[in-house]
């Protein structure tokens, strides 16, 4: 109050309006939480649960430990939240494909391409899953939302399969979950093992031409399996 009076008095003497008081800093809980999650995904992907450091996560997020414990409780809970966030990101991206608007064959082709290109663009997704598999999905088993998060994916594939069967281009008796596991495995195994595979076969499997060949091979395998035999 005294400072405000001094500013007003100074303004009166100089003929200038007093400078406005600085606006209070507004907290954005959602943005803070999102920054922490993004930093956690990177740290856990690089170092795993055991090697990841909360100090590094807070430094990446521009936050502090108090915020991590406030939002997530502990390091293991943060790891689970990072996993859920990673799955949520890919599932939302899949929904944006709008496969229900596409011809069944083109929709399946796009699904294969999307999965492959997503893995290439987000290598941290693969390493996060590798890390959780080392723990035998101990954290994901505690998730209350992970199965519901995947229901739209299964429904989307079931729709493609049903429309393809009705139009006579897809064979019957295909399980949507088994199909997705196969699509994911075709890219996941290649990328997660590219160092050893490149070494034992004497090829650079990550060069652009090799990646294009892999996508074409994956697409042919999936569509060839689904094709209705004449």
Over which residues does each language-model region extend?
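Amphipathic alpha-helical interaction segments
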Residues: 35, 106, 110, 114, ...
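Short hydrophobic clusters on alpha-helical segments that form packing/core surfaces
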Residues: 36-44, 115, 222
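Helix-turn-helix
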Residues: 2, 35, 43-77, 81
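C-terminal peripheral helix-coil segments that are non-catalytic and often amphipathic
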Residues: 1-20, 114-117, 121, 151-167, ...
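Generic hydrophobic, amphipathic alpha-helix propensity
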Residues: 32-40, 57, 82-86, 90, ...
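Amphipathic alpha-helical segments used for helix-helix packing
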Residues: 107, 121-144, 194-201
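Amphipathic alpha-helical linker/stalk segments
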Residues: 82-111, 141-144, 148
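All-alpha amphipathic helical-bundle segments outside canonical DNA-binding/catalytic cores
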Residues: 106, 145-149, 166-182
């Amino acid at each position: 109050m005294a400072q405000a009076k001094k500013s007003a008095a100074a303004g009166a003497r100089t003929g200038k309006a007093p400078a406005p008081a600085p606006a209070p800093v507004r907290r954005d809980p959602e943005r803070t939480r999102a920054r922490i999650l993004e930093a956690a995904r990177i740290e856990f992907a690089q170092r795993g649960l055991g090697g990841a450091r909360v100090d590094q996560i807070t430094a990446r997020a521009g936050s502090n430990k108090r915020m991590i414990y406030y939002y997530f409780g502990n390091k293991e809970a943060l790891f689970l939240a990072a996993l859920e966030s990673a799955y949520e990101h890919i599932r939302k991206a899949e929904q944006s494909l709008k496969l229900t608007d596409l011809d069944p064959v083109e929709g399946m082709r796009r699904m294969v391409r999307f999965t492959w290109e997503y893995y290439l663009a987000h290598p941290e997704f693969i390493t996060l899953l590798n890390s959780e598999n080392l723990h035998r999905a101990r954290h994901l088993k505690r998730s209350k939302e992970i199965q519901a998060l995947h229901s739209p994916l299964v429904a989307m594939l079931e729709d493609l399969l049903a429309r393809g069967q009705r139009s006579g281009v897809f064979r019957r008796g295909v399980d949507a979950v088994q199909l997705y596991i196969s699509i994911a495995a075709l890219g996941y195994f290649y990328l997660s093992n590219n160092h050893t595979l490149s070494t034992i076969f004497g090829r650079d499997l990550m060069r652009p031409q090799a990646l294009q060949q892999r996508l074409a091979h994956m697409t042919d395998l999936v569509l060839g399996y689904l094709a209705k035999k004449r």
